[in-house]
Amino acid sequence: MITKKNLAIFEINECDFKYFLKGATKYQFPLIKNYFKKKNKITTFTIDKEEGLNLDPWVQWVTVHTGIRSSRHKIYRLGQKLNNRTKQIWDIISLKGFSTTLWGLFNSNLRKKKNIDLFFPDPWSFTQKVYPQEFNDYLYLPKYYATNYPNIKLSKIIYFSYKFLKKVIFSKSFFYILKNFFSFIKIFSLAGLKSFNLYFFLDLISLEILCKNIEKKKSDFLIVALNSFAHYQHNFWDDDRFEFIYFWYLNEMIKKINYLEGYYNSTIFYNGFEQKKIKKKYFLRAKNPKRFLKILGLNFKRIEPNMTTGAQVFFDNDKDKSKCINFLKSIYLLDVPLFDVQKFKKNIFFKFNIYLYKKDFNIENLTLLNKNKYFNYLKKNNAKGLIYNNHSMLKKIFDNVILMKSTSEHTPKGTLYFKNIKLNKKQIENTKIFSKITNHFSL
């Protein structure tokens, strides 16, 4: 019998619960519907409204984990480090003497290791390390793929896949893959190595690893973050060919979550905030951000790509930093810059602003001869056009970018399912979740 105060939280980033339940009926996965029927539900909201600035997961999850709004914690980019004065939920709970496991949380920081059983950073983190180190081989593959997509080197993928699979094979998790071998064959025959399929697979195996780990040592406090459903909705929500795969993985993950919840009296299943389906559009992304800036003649120390259209760039000196800022800001769309550039003390962040509503226009071969045609095309599709008088530089830019599809946008509201934890109101701001969780371990 479970007697000690405990809590398991599953942060399924930006998932759409209505879509979950609709698909569960359509594809006959009753386990999914039954899982949510057994739980209480509240809605959450954030006062942040601007996608690309503060209405993003690497911002909102920091708000949830610290209990303070983004205007105070000022974390707006993947890989940014929270100041040490701001306490995270696990900082407080571990100090109370409760053992803790953290897996894949956006912009999470491990400060003290006392009462931390396992810390597995999100794959976009460039500063946080796995603890204990025996879990390192699980991180190399998702980290390389996440921070280098779409410019993936086959040799690197093979090497990191070998390290990952070797670790899985010599663990009990391999038996799960063997048991479901033919199901995986079917899924990969349908979707191949498309990014969403790999993210789903890695999230599912992460849960399987945690199931085996909890059998050996159960933490009092468990937080697991999964991003694969958000990735699918952002990039493939318009493609019905792969919808079954989404719900097959969801059903398998619910099985694992059910198993993990069996070790806990209290549970939370939360999406942070939701996405809404939109008319698909395409945005620009550098094929390789590091090479992209070098081709433009810019000097820098290192670069940390994010999961969308930009990257953080660090410099050896202020001269190189200023040159980069001035150059990127000098390139304009009809009425706004091609790049959004933000300046920080030690680095800058840049991203593309342009988007299109059709992919059939060959933007990569843009020349002066078709400039007017291009403007008319963009205006017709409610997009923005490019003005730049250095034509050779323009060609360099468009030769080194690709068009990425987007099929959803963020909304400021979320849904939280829970069991055996005090959440009395029907709606709360996401900043209030912090105190509800810390108070749970005080009662």
Predicted region positions:
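Metal-dependent active-site segment of extracytoplasmic phospho-/sulfohydrolases and closely related
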Residues: I9-E11, L31, Y246-R285, L416, ...
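Short, structured active-site-proximal loop/turn typified by the sulfatase FGly-forming signature C/S-X-P-X-R
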Residues: F20-V59, I68, R72, S99-W103
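Short, solvent-exposed loop/turn segments at secondary-structure junctions
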Residues: N13-F17, G52, R69-S71, F106-L110, ...
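Acidic/histidine-rich catalytic neighborhood
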Residues: L260, Y264-D316
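A structural signal for short, well-ordered beta-strand segments and their strand-loop junctions
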Residues: I9-E11, T44, S99-L105, F221-A225, ...
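His/Asp/Glu-rich, glycine-adjacent segments
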Residues: T66-W237, K323, K436
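A short acidic (Asp/Glu
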Residues: Y19-G23, K112-K114, Q233-W237, I278-Y282
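Membrane-interface soluble catalytic domains
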Residues: M1-T3, Y76-L82, T86-D91, K96, ...
